[in-house]
Amino acid sequence: NSKSLLDGSLDTRVYTDNANVSRVNVSDYVNPGKYEINIKTAATKATDTATDVGINSTGTGAIGASGTISINGSSVDIDANDTMSEVYEKIRAAAEVGEAEMKTDDGTFTGLQASRYGSSAALVITFSGKEGVSTTKDFATALGYTTDLTTDAKTGTMTYDAAKAGNSGTDAEVELSVGKVIAGTTDTSIFSNTATVATDGNRVTITDRDGFSMSFL
């Protein structure tokens, strides 16, 4: 609501009993009444589902290969003398800058997932081994990536093929009850037949009638 709270002029209040809805924004043109919005499918993140990926976060042994790994555009250099735990921390830090996050299991690095939800979520991982120290394949293998990699013939850079070993992010799917009795009540939804829904990740925006808008995530 765009009206000031200080002078007590707020006339539109929105309540939710769903702890997973963190914020609801409504325009000044929303009419008081019953609204029913059903989340059919929750938004998801892009995820790395490769097998045989695991760097022990407390390992003291040297990784044995050097190169550069890029996670969603955030690059970090890894030295052959870095311990597994040091490599783990470097990858974790790069992932955070690259809008990704570690997926851990029993203290080991088991993969990455995008920080954002929805179809715009990205998870692009590339490996580039340093010449004379290790091949790019050796470097990627040392980091635990042994499958589902494609190589650029010109640069030798290997890209994690998310299409083969990952799940793309998806937007939420919602359903509006238009002119129907809401379950368990005698009230009907006051959405009109022209109500439309737009989703962007886990953000849902509903427009209906002139000036009406409702957005939540």
Where are these regions (language model features)?
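Bacterial flagellar/type III secretion structural subunits and associated motility module proteins
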Residues: 3-217
